[in-house]
């Protein structure tokens, strides 16, 4: 599972680099499909990842407002800031605690295992990154490669 977090983070960082070719206006332009626009999609991925990780830790969810992150650099900085805490959770995940039950503040009376949550985080990011690829092609630009094969992944602990 760790390899998929490494993959997602590498692809996310490549999308941040890819986004530098667009203006802030283009990044914020509402589009068909997905969640509004390119910048908000990246923000949403980061926000959801962090909310689930905090739930695993038994911590209160922090409501991060997109209005405070209206530039590419601010969203990238948010991603980097949250990774520190996320790394701690990922490095302590093991087979012994993967079935530990977690409640989330946004769903009353529902429990998930740590393992389910981590798999959901991975799938959620891959899903939304796919939408970025669609929008890139609509802009007549090449998207970031989604291929897992042939990547040299940076270990989680090195972020």
UniProtKB/Swiss-Prot annotation:
Molecular function (GO) terms for this protein are: metal ion binding
User: Which InterPro entries has this protein been placed in?
Assistant: DinB, DinB/YfiT-like
Q: Which residues are connected by disulfide bridges in this protein? A: none
* UniProt binding sites for a divalent metal cation: 44, 124, 128
Q: Which UniProt keywords apply?
A: Metal-binding
Q: Which domain of life is it from?
A: Bacteria
Query: Per the record, a Pfam family?
Result: DinB
The family this protein is said to belong to: Belongs to the DinB family.
Q: What is this protein called?
A: Uncharacterized protein YizA
Taxon lineage:
Bacteria, Bacillati, Bacillota, Bacilli, Bacillales
Q: Its encoding gene is what?
A: yizA
């Amino acid at each position: 599972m760790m390899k998929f977090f490494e993959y997602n983070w590498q692809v996310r960082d490549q999308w941040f680099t890819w986004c530098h070719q667009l203006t802030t206006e283009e990044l914020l332009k509402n589009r068909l499909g997905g969640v509004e626009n390119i910048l908000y999609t990246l923000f949403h991925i980061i926000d959801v990842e962090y909310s689930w990780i905090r739930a695993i830790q038994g911590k209160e969810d922090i409501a991060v407002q997109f209005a405070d992150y209206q530039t590419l650099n601010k969203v990238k900085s948010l991603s980097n800031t949250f990774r520190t805490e996320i790394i701690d959770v990922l490095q302590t995940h093991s087979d012994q605690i993967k079935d530990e039950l977690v409640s989330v503040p946004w769903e009353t009376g529902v429990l998930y295992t740590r393992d389910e949550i981590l798999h959901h985080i991975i799938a959620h990011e891959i899903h939304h990154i796919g939408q970025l690829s669609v929008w890139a092609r609509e802009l007549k630009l090449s998207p970031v490669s989604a291929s897992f094969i042939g990547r040299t992944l940076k270990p989680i602990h090195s972020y």
